[in-house]
């Protein structure tokens, strides 16, 4: 009995030692453990991965033990968060910055795990998602100052984040009165004529245009960001690398949330940083720095960001380390599909205060009531504020606020991202959008994403195309009919992978059966074309092998061209050692020949003639070959229509055609001929016009005033309203009455 008691006491003491005796880091984090792995070794691994040429050296491995488990991180440089034109601006310098210290990976051997962070001076900072929740790693000196510690970093679990009760009236977001003032201001934007007309035209097209947009913009799913940090943010984190690591961590966090959300058929919404502006401590006194003042309210801080022109970006945010009133952690303009300005892709325009502003903006602070909030809190805040930009107001109603429900089952799942007050972040719904938010956001995305969203250039699991890093891709769970492949709704490490024991997937290519096996060598996988033979499966791959080309100079494209090396690329003239030319009317050719394929002898333009001419009868046997509709004709001065007529293109445009129509001599000749032929009709029209004018003068003359006093006065027009002067009251002298009778009369009134 004594031994178990001793063991329990030892385990309790060890647990307290690992968690720094159970002491919280600050009022937000109630439990942590220290990390003391070899920073020199990790720094060397980082330098090796940075210079890596071989595939294996590109991976960064980090192993450590914490919170009663082993972490074996396998990470690789993350380039998906920064655009090809990524720039870092600091103190009037623009740099092509190296982001090789940003990593993304997973825990080796743990399915569905995910990690993201940075390696600066041999220390990893970031977050690790596991089956048991998310862990956060930060430098120890960020929380524990002026002490010698046996560890250099701290790690804590998301469940150990303590959200204080006093979190502002709106839980980190501004109250309703602020949003109401912002909404009224957004309504005062003056739309530029061209953009307003294009938006009205798009709206008039209705659902048909939206369907076309959804098809053509399937890959335009990336919102490019411009992020600035003020001098207070830089002062807290200390270095440029640490600041960029924080930005990367925030963008990756919201990227994970938005990519996994289906916005009414719009999927894989992602984010990419295009430009970063870092205001260092030296910029605190710079008169050109709008954020240099220490005491700025949250609304004014957002306004300073909005006064800059952000037309080149989807969204523009400023990160700061300020303690705003009422515990506000973020503020952003709410987007709308139409009717008001603000949100994603909004362009700079003039507003009621006479200033031009960009309302595709927001702000985030990492300080709340004198303490710095954990990354988990600011990540959720960032996702919440971007949700406003995307068009979602705060959640309301029983459907979208289950945390307020009296049903314990619904209440246990918590509220969604766009809930007005603070969420703990550890409930099932805290990292998801409600149906209300999804409906609002999808409407804004349908209307606005074509204005500024770009193609990500990154592999997308769920788009039906097998790309780098994917074994297969059968789409999402509602689309995937494939028994061989895990759909895109599966967790990381599992989605777009072959199921165990399956040889292939039909999504890989046509040489895989629905039973997940390769087709035999004799099965056809591609029909023959003008210039290539049919494709035949090889029996050991799902891809259809390249087809053998047909012989060169085989006729193709309706006998107007010939095959060259398997491609329909040569002119039919080349088959007979001739060159193709253009029959032009200036050559005296018949207009009917302008849409014929014409050939000439090499280096002899004077021999240019139609394939149906006697000149080339020997080669083409009198067969006339016509150009395809839409082909240029008459020496590129027109195009062939479906009737093989050469339609000339008027380079002067519609105004010139209108001028020609009005002032054409032929027009006046035709009018003169008609008058001669129908002189009687012209005479009748002249008489009718004279009678009409006479009647008009006669009718109106009786109502017209005259200066001749002998004429009767004009008659008023029927229906004319006359203003009657009210009768003047007759003034009577007041009569003297006894006081009593006056009072009684006054009471009777």
Curated annotation (Swiss-Prot):
An example Gene Ontology molecular-function term: SH3 domain binding
Pfam families xref list: ADAM10_Cys-rich (PF21299), Disintegrin (PF00200), Reprolysin_2 (PF13574)
PTM characteristics: The precursor is cleaved by furin and PCSK7.
Residue span of region Interaction with AP2A1, AP2A2 and AP2M1: 735-749
Stretch forming the signal peptide: 1-18
Positions of short motif SH3-binding: 709-716, 723-729
Residues noted as binding Zn(2+) in the record, renumbered to the chain: 173, 384, 388, 394
GO biological process entries: adherens junction organization; amyloid precursor protein catabolic process; amyloid-beta formation; cochlea development; constitutive protein ectodomain proteolysis; epidermal growth factor receptor ligand maturation; in utero embryonic development; membrane protein ectodomain proteolysis
Disulfide bridges in this chain: 223-314, 345-452, 400-436, 461-496, 472-485, 474-480, 484-516, 504-512, 511-537, 525-544, 531-563, 556-568, 573-599, 581-608, 583-598, 595-640, 633-646
Transmembrane segments: 674-697
Tissues showing expression: Expressed in brain, kidney, lung, spleen, ovary and testis.
Pro-peptide region(s): 19-214
Subcellular localization: Cell membrane; Golgi apparatus membrane; Cytoplasmic vesicle, Clathrin-coated vesicle; Cell projection, Axon
Cofactor comment: Binds 1 zinc ion per subunit.
One GO location term (cellular component): postsynaptic membrane
Catalysis: reaction(s): Endopeptidase of broad specificity
Residues carrying Phosphothreonine: 720
Glycosylation sites: 268, 279, 440, 552
Record comment regarding domains: The Cys-rich region C-terminal to the disintegrin domain functions as a substrate-recognition module, it recognizes the EFNA5-EPHA3 Complex but not the individual proteins. Both Cys-rich and stalk region are necessary for interaction with TSPAN5, TSPAN10, TSPAN14, TSPAN17, TSPAN33. Stalk region is sufficient for interaction with TSPAN15. The propeptide keeps the metalloprotease in a latent form via a cysteine switch mechanism. This mechanism may be mediated by a highly conserved cysteine (Cys-173) in the propeptide, which interacts and neutralizes the zinc-coordinating HEXGHXXGXXHD catalytic core of the metalloprotease domain. The dissociation of the cysteine from the zinc ion upon the activation-peptide release activates the enzyme.
PANTHER family: ADAM10/ADAM17 METALLOPEPTIDASE FAMILY MEMBER, DISINTEGRIN AND METALLOPROTEINASE DOMAIN-CONTAINING PROTEIN 10
Quaternary structure (record): Forms a ternary EFNA5-EPHA3-ADAM10 complex mediating EFNA5 extracellular domain shedding by ADAM10 which regulates the EFNA5-EPHA3 complex internalization and function, the cleavage occurs in trans, with ADAM10 and its substrate being on the membranes of opposing cells. Interacts with the clathrin adapter AP2 complex subunits AP2A1, AP2A2, AP2B1, and AP2M1; this interaction facilitates ADAM10 endocytosis from the plasma membrane during long-term potentiation in hippocampal neurons.
Protein name (database record): Disintegrin and metalloproteinase domain-containing protein 10
Organism of derivation: Rattus norvegicus
